[in-house]
Structure formats: C-alpha cells, structure tokens
Amino acid sequence: MDYLGIDLSCAIGSLRNGEFPAKDCLLPLISKLLGYFLVAASMTVKLPQIMKIVDNKSVKGLSVVAFELEVIGYTISLAYCLNKDLPFSAFGELAFLLIQALILVACIYYFSQPLSVTTWVKAILYFAIAPTVFAGKIDPFLFEALYASKHLIFLSARIPQIWKNFRNKSTGQLSFLTCLMNFGGALARVFTSIQEKAPLSMLLGIVLSIFTNGIIMSQILLYRSKGNEDKLVKSKKIS
C-alpha cells in the first residue's frame, strides 16, 4: 500500500499480525511522515515575523541583507530540487518558505521607504533571473556550483543579523517564534536527511542552520531579558 510516496504495507502488515513494526520498517515511515509534517508546518514558519512587522509598522533591528540572501538561497535550493525530480516530501517546504521570504522582503521594503536605486535594481534583477533558474536553463556545472554555494549563502544570511543584534544589543522586531520554528525544523531535518541517505553537504547545511538559529534565539532571550530588567529599573526610579 503506497500513499503519497509512503509505503504503509510493512507497518500495516505487522500491526495486523499483532506485532510492533520492526525498526527497518518503522524508521523510514516516521521519516516520510515527519517530512510531510515539516512541509505542512513550513506554511506558517515566517508568518509570526511578517505579522510582527505589519503590526508594529517597523523593521527596526532587522538586517535587510540577511532576508535578501535567504530569498536567493531558497530560490537556488528549490530550483535544484525541482530539476532533480526529488520527492515533494524532501523539499516541499522550500516552496512555502520562498513565498513567505518574498513577502517578508516586500514588507521590509515597504516599511523602509523611500527605497534606494540599488534596492530597485536588486529586485528587478531577481525577477528577471529567477524564472531562468527555475526552468533549469543554465549550464549544469553552474547549477551544481550554485547549489553547492547555498550553505555559504544561508550562513551569510544569518551572520549580518547576528552581528547587528550584537552591535545594537537588541533584536528589534525579530520574531522568537519564527526562529524557534526554524530551529526545530532543522533538528527534525537531521533525522529525515539521515534516513533518506542525504549527502554530507546537505547535513552540514542543516547543522549550520541549527547553530546559527540557535545563536539568534539565544540573542533574543538575552537581550529581551536585559531590556525588561532595564525597564523595571527605570520604572522603580520614576516611582
């Protein structure tokens, strides 16, 4: 019995016989189900960040470069997976993350007006080149090189935000919930990637994501806790 690429016959057969499914049967099943869960969960990952920006009408403390690089990274990753005909459960979340990342950058641009000429040029170039990349109409060697560079791109996307947080001693409008979901999703992807026998480079990228998102989460907790303490001290002085 195969449903959405998930082979259920092994597990169902064991349960019918009153037996608990064996490890070799259960782990791949869990991996597939977890993969589809991550795809479903990815539909809301960046919504807390988008809502926080819209509600506060502010992008204070956010690194524009960081979010722009995320869009590039998701674009390359999704295009590569589509052209390699990988199963949707293995990369489906990339489609939803890219859509949300584009909305997020649009929100940042909207609340950062007036926009510079450079910003307009970057936006035009992206929408001019992206369709070609998605169609796979580029040199195969260049495509492989772009995909190999995605880990560096995502790492570069986190570093400006981490540095800005450290420099300002504040995380501004960063959403803790979005960072937490990114962190948890990366942890789950370690398991699914090992089960799907993903290449070492992919695992390395996931580990880097866990590390950088962990740093940003700790910064949010540290600086917001410090900010609350400062407010408490000021209120006591006033009273």
Swiss-Prot record:
The keyword Transport applies. GO terms for cellular component: membrane. InterPro entries: MannP-dilichol_defect-1 (IPR016817), PQ-loop_rpt (IPR006603). Signal peptide: none annotated. It is found in: Membrane. Disulfide bonds: none annotated. It is a multi-pass membrane protein. Keywords: Membrane, Repeat, Transmembrane, Transmembrane helix, Transport. PANTHER family: MANNOSE-P-DOLICHOL UTILIZATION DEFECT 1 LEC35 -RELATED, MANNOSE-P-DOLICHOL UTILIZATION DEFECT 1 PROTEIN HOMOLOG 1. This is Mannose-P-dolichol utilization defect 1 protein homolog 1.
